[in-house]
C-alpha cells in the first residue's frame, strides 16, 4: 500500500447531542483539524482508504462508523465506555481547573495543572489505543486526538 492510504480524510461527531461551551467547541475543532492533517488509521482487514469516521454515543456505548472517502461501508466498531469513565471524569475535573487557572492563576500553577491534564489525557489515549487494538491500528498521536473527541462527546452529552 502507498503511504497515506491508511488515514482519515474526514471526522464527524454526532450532531444530535448539540453544542457545548466555547472552550469545548474549540477543543473539538482543533482536534479534528489536527487529526485530519496528520493521522494513522488502519481498519484491520481493509485494503486502504482514505476513510471517513463518524463518532457517536449510542446506548452509552462509543460507536466508530467507518466508510471510505466515497462513502462505501468499511466497518462499525462499538466500544464499551466503562474503561473510560474514571479517566474522562478525572479529565473533566482537571480541565475545569485548567480553564479557571488560565483566567486567574500564576504561570507556574497553570503549568502544574497542564502537566496533570496531559498525563490524564495520555492515559485515556493509551486506553483508547488498547481498546481499538485488533480492530483499528492507530498511532499514539491519532489516539490522543480521538480521545479528545470522545471527551467532547461526553461534554456535550
Curated annotation (Swiss-Prot):
Pfam families associated with the record: UPF0262 (PF06793)
Domain of life: Bacteria
Disulfide-bond pairs as recorded: none
Family named by the database record: Belongs to the UPF0262 family.
Name of protein: UPF0262 protein RL0614
Originating species: Rhizobium johnstonii (strain DSM 114642 / LMG 32736 / 3841)
Amino acid at each position: 500500500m502507498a503511504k497515506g492510504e491508511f488515514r482519515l480524510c474526514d471526522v464527524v461527531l454526532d450532531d444530535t447531542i448539540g453544542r457545548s461551551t466555547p472552550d469545548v467547541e474549540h477543543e473539538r475543532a482543533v482536534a479534528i483539524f489536527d487529526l485530519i492533517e496528520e493521522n494513522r488509521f488502519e481498519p484491520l482487514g481493509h485494503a486502504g482508504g482514505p476513510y471517513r469516521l463518524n463518532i457517536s454515543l449510542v446506548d452509552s456505548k462509543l460507536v466508530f462508523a467507518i466508510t471510505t472517502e466515497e462513502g462505501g461501508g468499511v466497518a462499525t466498531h462499538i466500544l464499551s465506555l466503562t474503561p473510560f469513565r474514571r479517566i474522562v471524569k478525572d479529565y473533566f475535573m482537571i480541565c475545569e481547573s485548567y480553564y479557571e487557572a488560565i483566567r486567574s492563576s500564576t504561570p507556574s500553577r497553570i503549568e502544574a495543572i497542564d502537566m496533570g491534564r496531559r498525563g490524564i489525557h495520555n492515559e485515556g489515549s493509551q486506553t483508547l489505543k488498547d481498546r481499538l487494538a485488533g480492530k483499528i491500528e492507530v498511532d499514539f498521536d491519532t489516539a490522543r486526538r480521538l480521545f479528545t473527541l470522545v471527551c467532547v462527546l461526553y461534554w456535550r452529552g
